[in-house]
């Protein structure tokens, strides 16, 4: 761990400078040598970093949802080219390019936090060994070594020896108890975040491998925290716990205000939006207008919850406009049936004729032919009443009963025209 932390030593000075600045503020309130001053400085560092990472978090949400949408297509490509890995990779890259999706975008917040995480570990490890690091001088080093949170030094670790912990002014039991409590809290917060994501913010209409991956991570992360947590100082665990709590709150906000389409969270969100629109007759904020605009733009591709929302507005005499606003009047209202067919202005849906089978079509054509036969009788009678001069000349006598020569005239119904092949004699 020390080797990995040394790779991010270039960011140690900025991280230590930020901690010292926050410590100078909290030290005036709680005292310079207290664990609250140093602990809150670490918490403030986390908050500052996470605020700066909000744009990356938004990009992560979009990338994650795009990957969820592409999972069925990715599975088809994997099955189609399962014996050709190179072609499979080419088709995957082509799919990402066409959809404008980058698989690494969902990892950006974690990758961006890693340098700060290991830089903080480098700073606290220097405090534990009594070395000045970054902008932390001897005076600040002595103050940080005296800082305890719930009886455990911020620079102490679960795996430290009893003598090393005693030099920091604490007992090994205190360090291990505080470390265990923090690991449990970290695991619980991460488990709750993943469970909320799995149960409320996943499209229930699509079963993808992504859901299985999320379910696996829900149980893997607590085990990882237990394994790696005992090797980190208490101050780093404070950083880690604060990050998990921030992520949990951020995820709850996203689930409530920007849920995944087709999820249970979207059903609850549209129900709240429907009550507000029916009560006030309009959308309240830019975010609500963006949601309504996206629903209108989907057309027949709307899911079940979105169709219910549009139909509820139509029944109330309201109409969702293409710009996300809500207007009145049935002329522009858009309603949808359960299969996604749109109807405008509450007009009844035209019934489509049922498709007939082949036997039904044949019986219908035979019946129509039978009804048309009596109609041809008057025509034949009228032809017989024509004058004699209008009739064609009769054939000469003797030629009426004379059969015509040629093989074509001898062909009867059921026979093949042309020279007939003699039958072979039967063998007895």
Curated annotation (Swiss-Prot):
Look up and give the membrane topology term: Multi-pass membrane protein
Ranges annotated as biased composition (Basic and acidic residues): 383-392
Q: What is a single cellular component term in the Gene Ontology annotation? A: plasma membrane
Q: Which residues cross the membrane?
A: 3-23, 38-58, 220-240
Q: Where is the composition biased (Low complexity)?
A: 359-369
For bias kind Basic residues, which ranges apply?
418-428
Q: What InterPro entries would the database entry show?
A: YidC/ALB3/OXA1/COX18, YidC/Oxa/ALB_C, YidC_ALB_C
Compositional bias annotation for Polar residues: 402-415
Q: Where in the cell is it found?
A: Cell membrane
Question: A biological process (GO) annotation for this entry?
Answer: protein transport
A GO molecular function annotation here is: membrane insertase activity
Write down the superkingdom of origin. Bacteria
Region of interest (Disordered), residue spans: 330-428
Give the primary localization class. membrane
Keywords (alphabetical) are: Cell membrane, Chaperone, Membrane, Protein transport, Transmembrane, Transmembrane helix, Transport
What subunit structure does UniProt give?
Interacts with the Sec translocase complex via SecD. Specifically interacts with transmembrane segments of nascent integral membrane proteins during membrane integration.
Q: Its family?
A: Belongs to the OXA1/ALB3/YidC family. Type 1 subfamily.
Q: What the protein does?
A: Required for the insertion and/or proper folding and/or complex formation of integral membrane proteins into the membrane. Involved in integration of membrane proteins that insert both dependently and independently of the Sec translocase complex, as well as at least some lipoproteins. Aids folding of multispanning membrane proteins.
Query: What protein name does the entry list?
Result: Membrane protein insertase YidC
Per the UniProt record, the source organism is Streptomyces avermitilis (strain ATCC 31267 / DSM 46492 / JCM 5070 / NBRC 14893 / NCIMB 12804 / NRRL 8165 / MA-4680)
């Amino acid at each position: 761990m020390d080797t990995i932390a040394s790779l991010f030593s270039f960011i140690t000075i900025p991280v230590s400078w930020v901690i010292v600045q926050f410590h100078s503020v909290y030290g005036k309130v709680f005292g310079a040598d207290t664990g609250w001053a140093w602990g809150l400085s670490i918490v403030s560092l986390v908050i500052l970093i996470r605020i700066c990472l909000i744009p990356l978090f938004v990009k992560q949400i979009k990338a994650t949802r795009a990957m969820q949408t592409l999972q069925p297509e990715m599975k088809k490509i994997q099955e189609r080219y399962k014996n050709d890995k190179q072609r499979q990779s080419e088709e995957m890259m082509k799919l990402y390019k066409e959809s404008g999706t980058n698989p690494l975008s969902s990892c950006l917040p974690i990758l961006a936090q890693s340098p700060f995480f290991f830089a903080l570990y480098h700073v606290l490890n220097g405090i534990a060994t009594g070395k000045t690091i970054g902008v932390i001088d001897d005076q600040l080093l002595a103050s940080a070594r005296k800082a305890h949170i719930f009886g455990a030094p911020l620079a102490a670790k679960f795996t430290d020896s009893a003598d090393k912990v005693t030099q920091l002014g604490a007992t090994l039991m205190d360090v291990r108890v505080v470390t265990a409590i923090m690991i449990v809290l970290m695991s619980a917060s991460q488990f709750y975040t993943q469970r909320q994501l799995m149960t409320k913010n996943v499209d229930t209409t699509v079963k993808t491998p992504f859901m299985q991956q999320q379910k696996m991570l829900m149980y893997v992360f607590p085990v990882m925290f237990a394994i790696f947590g005992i090797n980190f100082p208490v101050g780093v665990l404070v950083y880690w716990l604060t990050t998990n709590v921030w992520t949990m709150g951020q995820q709850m906000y996203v689930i409530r205000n920007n849920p995944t389409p087709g999820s249970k969270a979207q059903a609850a969100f549209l129900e709240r939006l429907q009550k507000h629109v029916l009560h006030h007759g309009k959308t309240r904020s830019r975010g609500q207008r963006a949601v309504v605009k996206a629903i209108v733009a989907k057309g027949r591709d709307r899911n079940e919850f979105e169709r219910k929302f549009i139909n509820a507005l139509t029944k109330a005499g309201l109409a969702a406009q293409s710009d996300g606003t809500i207007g009145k009047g049935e002329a522009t209202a858009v309603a949808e049936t359960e299969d996604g067919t749109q109807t405008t202005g509450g007009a009844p849906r035209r019934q489509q004729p049922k498709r007939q089978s082949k036997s039904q079509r044949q019986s219908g054509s035979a019946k129509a032919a039978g009804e048309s036969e009596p109609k041809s009788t008057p025509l034949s009678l009228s032809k017989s009443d024509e004058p004699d001069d209008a009739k064609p000349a009769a054939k000469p006598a003797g030629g009426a009963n004379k059969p015509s020569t040629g093989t074509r005239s001898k062909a009867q119904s059921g026979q093949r025209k042309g020279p007939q092949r003699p039958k072979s004699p039967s063998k007895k």
